[in-house]
Amino acid sequence: MKKSSLLYKIINGIWDMCFIWKTEMRNVFRDEGVLIFCILVPLGYPLLYSWIYNNEVVREVDTAIVDLSHSHTSREFIRDYDASPDVKATYYCNSLDEAKQLVQRQAVHGIIYIPADFDTKLNRGEQAHVGVYCDMSLMLTYKAIFQTAQGVASQINSGIQISKGGGFTDRDDEITAHPLEFDEVPIFNTTGGYGNAILPGVLVLILQQTMLLGIGMAAGTSRELNRNRELIPVSEHYGGIFRIVFGKSMVYFMVYAVMGMYLTLVVPKLFGFVSMVTWTTILGFLLPYILSCVFFGLMLSCLVRYRENVMLLVVFTSVPLLFMTGISWPQSNIPAFWQGFAWVFPSTFGIRGFLRISSMGASLADILPEFRALWIQTGVYFLATCLVFRQQLRSARLKANLTAEVAEEEDEADELLEAKK
């Protein structure tokens, strides 16, 4: 077969691509850092995170009570508050400063403050206030304290309305306290828990962040092992852009195809989280998401000079990326600039799409905007990766030629010196 024929070039390109794939796959399993980020972290971290929030809600949250009113109504408020399964009136303090010291020592997670004029204002027909102070370091404890206090206050308000309503029958009192009856039926997050709300987004974000860390660390290793500190080695197998890009991308796509199915199907089932995922829908959704993450990571790998650099580039972005998706903060309240900035990352559309698939049972047709955006990102980042690797290949060849010329000049100088001797 002639070397100039098209068939020979295709076969040679496939052979080189397989060689690059084999080399990269071997490096993934031999490099401890890459192995940790690409295999161990995606396997272990979701289990730890899911186990932490497996209970969905917290019970018996310790609370400090500051009752300066010492009235019948204030005692009723405290008694009803303590009767809730979510909170516990652990300490009774004489001042707000004393309660603050308990919060500082982490003995309690919140304070209920009832002022001295609480009952007096109620008897005058004025609006009374109850202060609720919560430790915001853990959202679950904040939710338990605040919602319980709000529920008790609503119940006492209903009793005040009934006493002042002047009704003659129980039905009159019922209408006075609850003029509009409604049934609260959670449609998607049936437990109302933190795990079902946040975990789907975290799982998808883990997929992207660990991939970026693994690809970046592998790129840093390649530069450190290269004599010229280049990303691409000068070799006959690394002679074309597409064979390099496809060879490297195949490695991470194969690894994270398995990890993606594990994170989206296995982990939610293990811990009993709400999951309405069908394997056909998730397969179609993960295909563009993983590809876009792979090409995004390969494109960014040119910025990594040393193995440690990738930690600075990737790790600190995890929490901001989660916020910018709109999963833990309303998307309508995110400034337009940050919403546009979030479109750069595949995790933005990946989290939004997977949350609808997992919690709402959406099909690919229902998440068409996110699905299209992921395919657009795949195409854009693939072209960007090809351009980046083209520049890296040129730089590697240029430095290799300069090194060879310098070596030849040194050899000629040595020969001249020997001839003179």
Predicted segments, located by residue:
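Extracytoplasmic/periplasmic domains immediately adjacent to an N-terminal transmembrane anchor
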Residues: 1-196, 366, 391, 397-421
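Alpha-helical membrane-protein architecture signal
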Residues: 14, 18-22, 196, 237-250, ...
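Loop-to-transmembrane-helix entry motif
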Residues: 28-35, 206, 247-253, 257, ...
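Hydrophobic core positions of alpha-helical segments in small-molecule transporters
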Residues: 37-38, 200, 246-247, 310-313, ...
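Hydrophobic alpha-helical transmembrane segments of integral membrane proteins
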Residues: 38-39, 196-197, 316-317, 342
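Hydrophobic alpha-helical transmembrane segments of multi-pass membrane transport proteins
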Residues: 44-47, 185-268
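Membrane-spanning alpha-helical segments of multipass transporters and channels
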Residues: 48-49, 70, 91, 101, ...
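Hydrophobic alpha-helical segments typical of transmembrane helices
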Residues: 73-77, 148, 215, 295, ...
